[in-house]
Structures are given as structure tokens and as C-alpha cells.
Amino acid sequence: YRLNVVRRNLKASFPEKSRKELRQLERAFYLHFTDYVVETMKLSHISLEELQRRAFLCNPEMVDQLMNEGHTCFILMMGHLGNWEWFSGSTTRFEDSRIYQIYRPLNNKAFDELFIHLRTRFGSYCIKKNDAARDMIRLKHDKTRCVVIFLADQTPSKANLHYWTEFLHQDTPFLNGPERIASKLDLPVIYLDTRRVRRGYYTVDMKLITSTPRETP
């Protein structure tokens, strides 16, 4: 699967590594990718209890604490780490809160419908990325108790290449849409730090980026 792309990216990201080391990384990537595919398909029948045991959210009380301080809506940022698809079920630990996931529709309609089904099976909702700002303004206005999950490492569209930085030895554009939305609506931002414990088991530690985005540079 996309072998030439994988090899090109590994070589550009780790120029100091030998050919043997790059092949080891390549093998590790494909092993993990295979696990990701199998685990994601498992979402079609895994129980919520089993999912939350395998994708363990360490400190969900952070959201409860912020809600007690008067906040009703939050932005959760995470990357394509571990198995990000599994954490739609883990976030049901947020009591009395709706879970929304911002997603980019797939070109293949059948696969798009499949992934929406898997992501919403435990009661969360999907919002298309182009509708994110409008829908979040509505959620804020309606004072809906909710958390909104963004994948922070998506590549921006050509019209939204506003912020660049060096990442893995390459100039890389990053999304700044969530930052603009958080500042405009004054929504707390939390990063979900994902770790792989062992095969088929992950943990997420919630780390507060800011509870006062309008005051954050």
C-alpha cells in the first residue's frame, strides 16, 4: 500500500538513518497500519465496555471541572496516533455531553458511509469540516454541553495555508482553523496525548492547552 510514498517520506523525515534502519521503520509502519485497519473494523461489533478498556481515557474529570467553572463547549485536539478512531467511544465518559467529531468526507461514498457508521455507533455525531465553524457557533449559542474533536495534523487546503513550521526536516503547513474558532468563541482547548501501551491497548492523557483562548497569544 503506497510503498513508494512511505519510503520517500521516511527518507525525507529521517535522513540520518541507514537503509537498514529505514527498512525497519517501514516494516514497523506496515505492522501498525495493519493493526489499525483490523482494530477499526472491530468497531462494528466491539462493546462499549471493551472499547473503553482498550482505549482508556486517563483523566475525563478535566472536562467535568471546566464545566463546573461555567464552560459548556470544548475543543479536543488529537493526532493520527495510536488508533484515533477508537476514542469516539472513550469520550462517552463525558457525562451529559454530546460528542462531535470534525471529519473530512472520503471520496468513496461507500467507505465514507462506513466510517460515519463506525464513528457514530456509540452516540457521537459527525460534522463535515466545511460546516465546523457554523455548527460550533450554533452549539455555543444554544449552550449545548459538548466536546468537539479535531484531528490537529490534517493537511490544510491550498486556500488555508496560513501557518508553516519545520517538522521532521520538512517545511510543513498546519491547520489553524481550530485556533481561530477557539479564540472567536472562547472555547477551552485540550490536547489528547495518545500512547500505545501494547498491541490493541492505548491510553489518552488530557492536557489543557488553554481555558482562556482569547487571552492566549
Q: What is the role of each PLM region?
A:
Residues 1-12, 28-48:
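A transmembrane-helix-recognition feature enriched in membrane-embedded lipid enzymes
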Residues 2-3, 20, 196:
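Catalytic machinery of carbohydrate-active enzymes
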Residues 12, 16, 212-215:
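General structural signal for alpha-helix termini and helix-helix connectors
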Residues 14-26:
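Short, surface-exposed acidic
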Residues 44-217:
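Soluble catalytic domains of membrane acyltransferases
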